[in-house]
Amino acid sequence: MQFSVVSPAQRTPMLISVLLLMAVTTAPLSAQTQRPMTFLDVQELARPGSWTPSPDGQWMLYTISTPDWQEDTSQVDIHLVSMSGGLPSSRQMTFTTDDNESSPQWSRDSSFFVFASDRDAPVTESVNQLYFMRPDGGEARQITNVEKGVADFAFSFDGTWLAYRSGEVGLEQLYRLPVDDLFLADADQVTDGEAGIEDWTWARDSQSIYFIRQNFRDEDDVRRREENFTVDIKNAVTPFSNLWVTDLASQSVRQLTNLPDASVTDFELSLDGQWATFVGGSTERYERNITASRLYADQYLLELSTEHIERLTENFEIAESD
Protein backbone atom coordinates (compact mmCIF):
# COMPACT_ATOMS: atom_id res chain seq x y z
CA MET A 1 0.00 0.00 0.00
CA GLN A 2 1.32 3.45 -0.91
CA PHE A 3 0.74 6.63 1.04
CA SER A 4 1.14 10.16 -0.28
CA VAL A 5 2.21 13.06 1.90
CA VAL A 6 0.08 16.16 1.42
CA SER A 7 1.75 19.45 2.33
CA PRO A 8 -0.10 22.24 4.18
CA ALA A 9 -0.09 24.28 0.98
CA GLN A 10 -1.79 21.41 -0.85
CA ARG A 11 -4.27 20.85 1.98
CA THR A 12 -5.48 24.45 1.97
CA PRO A 13 -7.47 24.26 -1.32
CA MET A 14 -8.99 20.94 -0.22
CA LEU A 15 -10.06 22.36 3.15
CA ILE A 16 -11.56 25.40 1.45
CA SER A 17 -13.59 23.12 -0.82
CA VAL A 18 -14.89 21.18 2.19
CA LEU A 19 -15.76 24.37 4.03
CA LEU A 20 -17.68 25.65 1.02
CA LEU A 21 -19.63 22.40 0.93
CA MET A 22 -20.26 22.67 4.67
CA ALA A 23 -21.65 26.19 4.26
CA VAL A 24 -24.03 25.06 1.53
CA THR A 25 -25.23 21.96 3.40
CA THR A 26 -27.37 23.53 6.12
CA ALA A 27 -29.76 20.63 6.89
CA PRO A 28 -29.77 16.83 6.71
CA LEU A 29 -30.49 15.58 3.21
CA SER A 30 -33.25 13.31 4.54
CA ALA A 31 -35.14 16.32 5.86
CA GLN A 32 -34.98 18.22 2.59
CA THR A 33 -37.42 18.00 -0.27
CA GLN A 34 -35.68 18.12 -3.60
CA ARG A 35 -36.62 21.18 -5.65
CA PRO A 36 -34.90 23.69 -7.88
CA MET A 37 -32.73 26.19 -6.02
CA THR A 38 -34.17 29.71 -5.97
CA PHE A 39 -32.56 33.13 -5.74
CA LEU A 40 -33.69 33.38 -2.12
CA ASP A 41 -32.01 30.04 -1.33
CA VAL A 42 -28.72 31.46 -2.56
CA GLN A 43 -29.17 34.63 -0.51
CA GLU A 44 -29.71 32.58 2.66
CA LEU A 45 -26.54 30.49 2.30
CA ALA A 46 -23.87 30.99 4.95
CA ARG A 47 -20.68 32.07 3.19
CA PRO A 48 -17.12 31.17 4.22
CA GLY A 49 -14.25 33.54 3.43
CA SER A 50 -10.97 35.12 4.57
CA TRP A 51 -9.10 31.79 4.57
CA THR A 52 -5.81 32.39 6.40
CA PRO A 53 -3.37 29.48 6.99
CA SER A 54 -0.97 29.94 9.91
CA PRO A 55 2.71 30.45 8.98
CA ASP A 56 3.64 27.14 10.65
CA GLY A 57 1.06 25.27 8.54
CA GLN A 58 -0.83 23.88 11.54
CA TRP A 59 -4.05 25.92 11.46
CA MET A 60 -6.32 27.88 9.19
CA LEU A 61 -8.61 30.74 10.19
CA TYR A 62 -11.70 31.54 8.17
CA THR A 63 -14.90 33.53 8.55
CA ILE A 64 -18.54 32.50 8.20
CA SER A 65 -21.02 35.17 7.14
CA THR A 66 -24.61 34.35 8.15
CA PRO A 67 -27.25 36.40 6.30
CA ASP A 68 -30.56 37.66 7.63
CA TRP A 69 -32.69 38.09 4.54
CA GLN A 70 -35.61 39.77 6.30
CA GLU A 71 -33.43 42.35 8.05
CA ASP A 72 -31.16 42.77 5.00
CA THR A 73 -28.08 42.23 7.14
CA SER A 74 -25.40 39.63 7.73
CA GLN A 75 -23.25 38.70 10.71
CA VAL A 76 -19.66 37.44 10.54
CA ASP A 77 -17.76 35.22 13.00
CA ILE A 78 -14.29 33.68 12.93
CA HIS A 79 -13.67 29.91 12.87
CA LEU A 80 -10.53 27.79 13.20
CA VAL A 81 -9.67 24.43 11.65
CA SER A 82 -6.65 22.15 12.04
CA MET A 83 -4.80 21.58 8.76
CA SER A 84 -4.12 17.97 9.76
CA GLY A 85 -7.42 17.24 11.53
CA GLY A 86 -9.62 18.63 8.76
CA LEU A 87 -13.31 19.45 9.02
CA PRO A 88 -14.07 17.51 12.26
CA SER A 89 -11.59 19.79 14.09
CA SER A 90 -13.29 23.02 12.99
CA ARG A 91 -14.52 25.23 15.81
CA GLN A 92 -16.03 28.68 16.17
CA MET A 93 -13.79 31.26 17.85
CA THR A 94 -16.08 34.31 18.17
CA PHE A 95 -19.74 34.37 19.15
CA THR A 96 -21.16 37.86 18.74
CA THR A 97 -24.76 38.06 17.55
CA ASP A 98 -25.12 41.61 16.25
CA ASP A 99 -21.48 42.52 15.60
CA ASN A 100 -18.89 41.34 13.10
CA GLU A 101 -15.42 39.83 13.39
CA SER A 102 -13.44 39.91 10.15
CA SER A 103 -10.03 39.97 8.43
CA PRO A 104 -8.13 37.57 10.74
CA GLN A 105 -4.33 37.65 10.37
CA TRP A 106 -1.76 35.42 12.07
CA SER A 107 1.29 36.66 13.91
CA ARG A 108 4.47 35.54 12.17
CA ASP A 109 5.19 32.92 14.85
CA SER A 110 1.61 31.53 14.68
CA SER A 111 1.13 32.01 18.44
CA PHE A 112 -1.84 34.38 18.09
CA PHE A 113 -3.96 36.20 15.56
CA VAL A 114 -5.43 39.67 15.22
CA PHE A 115 -8.82 40.51 13.78
CA ALA A 116 -11.04 43.53 13.19
CA SER A 117 -14.40 43.92 14.92
CA ASP A 118 -17.07 46.52 15.58
CA ARG A 119 -18.13 44.77 18.82
CA ASP A 120 -17.30 47.79 21.00
CA ALA A 121 -18.39 50.50 18.57
CA PRO A 122 -21.08 53.01 19.57
CA VAL A 123 -24.58 52.06 18.48
CA THR A 124 -24.68 54.98 16.05
CA GLU A 125 -21.35 54.09 14.41
CA SER A 126 -19.79 51.10 12.70
CA VAL A 127 -16.05 51.41 13.21
CA ASN A 128 -13.63 48.52 13.62
CA GLN A 129 -10.97 48.13 16.28
CA LEU A 130 -8.24 45.47 16.43
CA TYR A 131 -8.42 42.48 18.80
CA PHE A 132 -5.97 39.80 19.95
CA MET A 133 -6.80 36.11 20.37
CA ARG A 134 -4.86 32.86 20.72
CA PRO A 135 -5.77 29.71 18.75
CA ASP A 136 -6.48 27.81 21.97
CA GLY A 137 -9.34 30.21 22.66
CA GLY A 138 -10.03 32.53 25.55
CA GLU A 139 -11.58 35.98 25.51
CA ALA A 140 -10.40 38.40 22.84
CA ARG A 141 -8.37 41.38 24.07
CA GLN A 142 -8.79 44.81 22.51
CA ILE A 143 -5.62 46.32 21.01
CA THR A 144 -6.72 49.65 19.53
CA ASN A 145 -9.21 52.28 20.57
CA VAL A 146 -8.89 54.94 17.89
CA GLU A 147 -11.63 57.46 17.20
CA LYS A 148 -12.08 56.77 13.50
CA GLY A 149 -11.51 53.03 13.76
CA VAL A 150 -9.11 50.85 11.78
CA ALA A 151 -9.46 50.52 8.01
CA ASP A 152 -6.94 47.68 7.53
CA PHE A 153 -3.77 46.26 9.10
CA ALA A 154 -0.76 43.98 8.50
CA PHE A 155 2.17 42.45 10.38
CA SER A 156 5.71 43.26 9.27
CA PHE A 157 7.51 40.32 7.66
CA ASP A 158 9.95 40.01 10.58
CA GLY A 159 7.00 39.86 12.98
CA THR A 160 8.08 42.78 15.17
CA TRP A 161 5.48 45.37 14.13
CA LEU A 162 1.74 45.60 13.56
CA ALA A 163 0.81 48.46 11.23
CA TYR A 164 -2.69 49.78 10.62
CA ARG A 165 -4.45 52.53 8.66
CA SER A 166 -6.80 54.88 10.45
CA GLY A 167 -8.34 58.32 10.17
CA GLU A 168 -11.12 60.35 8.64
CA VAL A 169 -12.19 59.18 5.17
CA GLY A 170 -9.75 60.66 2.67
CA LEU A 171 -7.24 61.51 5.41
CA GLU A 172 -6.25 58.01 6.64
CA GLN A 173 -2.65 57.65 7.83
CA LEU A 174 -0.45 54.70 8.84
CA TYR A 175 0.45 53.79 12.42
CA ARG A 176 2.48 50.97 13.97
CA LEU A 177 2.61 49.11 17.28
CA PRO A 178 5.40 46.83 18.59
CA VAL A 179 4.18 43.23 18.65
CA ASP A 180 5.86 42.60 22.00
CA ASP A 181 3.86 45.46 23.61
CA LEU A 182 0.54 45.58 21.78
CA PHE A 183 -1.63 46.53 24.74
CA LEU A 184 0.38 49.25 26.48
CA ALA A 185 2.49 50.95 23.82
CA ASP A 186 1.38 54.16 22.12
CA ALA A 187 1.10 53.79 18.36
CA ASP A 188 3.71 55.59 16.24
CA GLN A 189 2.30 57.59 13.33
CA VAL A 190 4.50 56.78 10.35
CA THR A 191 2.88 58.88 7.61
CA ASP A 192 1.44 62.37 7.41
CA GLY A 193 0.08 64.55 4.63
CA GLU A 194 -2.86 66.51 3.33
CA ALA A 195 -4.28 63.44 1.56
CA GLY A 196 -4.97 59.98 2.92
CA ILE A 197 -3.16 56.70 2.32
CA GLU A 198 -4.79 54.36 -0.20
CA ASP A 199 -3.16 50.98 -0.98
CA TRP A 200 -0.07 50.07 1.12
CA THR A 201 2.24 47.17 1.97
CA TRP A 202 5.29 46.31 4.07
CA ALA A 203 8.70 45.98 2.42
CA ARG A 204 10.17 42.48 2.67
CA ASP A 205 12.96 43.70 4.96
CA SER A 206 10.36 45.27 7.31
CA GLN A 207 12.36 48.52 7.29
CA SER A 208 9.91 50.54 5.21
CA ILE A 209 6.32 50.74 4.00
CA TYR A 210 5.24 51.51 0.44
CA PHE A 211 1.95 53.27 -0.19
CA ILE A 212 -0.19 55.13 -2.72
CA ARG A 213 -1.40 58.63 -1.91
CA GLN A 214 -3.32 61.24 -3.87
CA ASN A 215 -1.49 64.49 -4.63
CA PHE A 216 -4.08 66.45 -2.68
CA ARG A 217 -7.47 66.07 -1.05
CA ASP A 218 -10.43 67.23 -3.12
CA GLU A 219 -11.92 69.66 -0.59
CA ASP A 220 -14.64 70.78 -3.00
CA ASP A 221 -15.92 67.21 -3.25
CA VAL A 222 -15.76 66.86 0.53
CA ARG A 223 -17.86 69.99 1.02
CA ARG A 224 -20.39 68.83 -1.58
CA ARG A 225 -20.90 65.55 0.23
CA GLU A 226 -21.06 67.20 3.64
CA GLU A 227 -23.92 69.30 2.28
CA ASN A 228 -25.57 66.08 1.02
CA PHE A 229 -25.02 67.06 -2.60
CA THR A 230 -24.15 63.51 -3.61
CA VAL A 231 -25.02 63.64 -7.30
CA ASP A 232 -22.16 62.04 -9.25
CA ILE A 233 -20.42 64.52 -11.53
CA LYS A 234 -19.64 62.91 -14.85
CA ASN A 235 -15.97 63.07 -15.81
CA ALA A 236 -15.13 65.06 -12.69
CA VAL A 237 -11.60 66.34 -12.25
CA THR A 238 -10.02 64.16 -9.57
CA PRO A 239 -6.55 64.19 -7.95
CA PHE A 240 -3.76 62.04 -9.38
CA SER A 241 -2.05 59.45 -7.17
CA ASN A 242 1.60 58.46 -6.80
CA LEU A 243 3.70 55.74 -5.16
CA TRP A 244 5.64 56.66 -2.03
CA VAL A 245 7.89 54.92 0.52
CA THR A 246 8.49 55.74 4.18
CA ASP A 247 11.72 54.65 5.86
CA LEU A 248 10.83 53.72 9.43
CA ALA A 249 14.31 54.15 10.91
CA SER A 250 14.91 57.67 9.60
CA GLN A 251 11.20 58.59 9.52
CA SER A 252 11.73 59.99 6.03
CA VAL A 253 9.18 59.82 3.21
CA ARG A 254 10.10 59.73 -0.48
CA GLN A 255 7.96 60.01 -3.60
CA LEU A 256 8.84 57.32 -6.16
CA THR A 257 6.63 58.26 -9.12
CA ASN A 258 5.69 61.54 -10.76
CA LEU A 259 4.72 60.64 -14.31
CA PRO A 260 2.92 63.35 -16.30
CA ASP A 261 0.69 60.83 -18.09
CA ALA A 262 0.01 58.19 -15.42
CA SER A 263 -1.79 58.13 -12.07
CA VAL A 264 -0.87 55.12 -9.89
CA THR A 265 -3.83 52.91 -8.95
CA ASP A 266 -2.22 49.76 -7.47
CA PHE A 267 1.19 48.12 -7.11
CA GLU A 268 3.09 44.96 -6.13
CA LEU A 269 6.60 44.44 -4.73
CA SER A 270 8.87 41.66 -5.97
CA LEU A 271 9.79 38.87 -3.54
CA ASP A 272 13.46 39.90 -3.61
CA GLY A 273 12.60 43.51 -2.78
CA GLN A 274 14.35 44.86 -5.86
CA TRP A 275 11.38 45.83 -8.01
CA ALA A 276 7.89 47.24 -7.91
CA THR A 277 5.25 46.92 -10.59
CA PHE A 278 2.41 49.38 -10.70
CA VAL A 279 -0.63 50.24 -12.78
CA GLY A 280 -0.69 53.75 -14.17
CA GLY A 281 -4.04 55.06 -15.31
CA SER A 282 -4.41 57.82 -17.86
CA THR A 283 -4.29 61.39 -16.55
CA GLU A 284 -6.61 62.57 -19.32
CA ARG A 285 -9.88 63.68 -17.73
CA TYR A 286 -12.19 61.95 -20.20
CA GLU A 287 -10.15 58.74 -20.23
CA ARG A 288 -9.54 58.16 -16.52
CA ASN A 289 -13.13 58.66 -15.32
CA ILE A 290 -15.18 57.38 -18.24
CA THR A 291 -14.96 53.78 -17.02
CA ALA A 292 -13.70 51.72 -14.11
CA SER A 293 -12.54 48.95 -16.45
CA ARG A 294 -8.93 50.23 -16.79
CA LEU A 295 -9.31 50.72 -20.53
CA TYR A 296 -6.59 53.37 -20.45
CA ALA A 297 -4.24 51.87 -17.87
CA ASP A 298 -0.73 50.51 -18.39
CA GLN A 299 1.79 48.37 -16.54
CA TYR A 300 5.05 49.91 -15.31
CA LEU A 301 8.21 48.47 -13.76
CA LEU A 302 10.14 50.42 -11.11
CA GLU A 303 13.69 49.50 -10.09
CA LEU A 304 13.74 50.48 -6.42
CA SER A 305 17.51 51.00 -6.11
CA THR A 306 17.71 53.51 -8.98
CA GLU A 307 14.04 54.61 -9.16
CA HIS A 308 14.18 54.02 -12.92
CA ILE A 309 10.70 53.46 -14.40
CA GLU A 310 10.00 51.42 -17.52
CA ARG A 311 6.62 51.40 -19.25
CA LEU A 312 5.72 47.83 -20.18
CA THR A 313 2.44 48.21 -22.09
CA GLU A 314 0.77 50.67 -24.48
CA ASN A 315 -2.95 50.11 -23.99
CA PHE A 316 -5.77 52.00 -25.66
CA GLU A 317 -9.33 50.94 -24.85
CA ILE A 318 -8.05 47.50 -23.82
CA ALA A 319 -8.75 46.23 -20.31
CA GLU A 320 -6.19 43.95 -18.67
CA SER A 321 -6.99 41.23 -16.16
CA ASP A 322 -4.92 40.13 -13.16
Predicted regions and their residues:
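Bacterial N-terminal signal peptides
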Residues: 14-26
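Residue-level detector of Asp-centered blade-edge/turn motifs that repeat once per structural unit
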Residues: 55-56, 108-109, 157-158, 204-205, ...
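A short helix->beta-strand "capping" segment at the edge of beta-propeller domains
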Residues: 32-46, 90
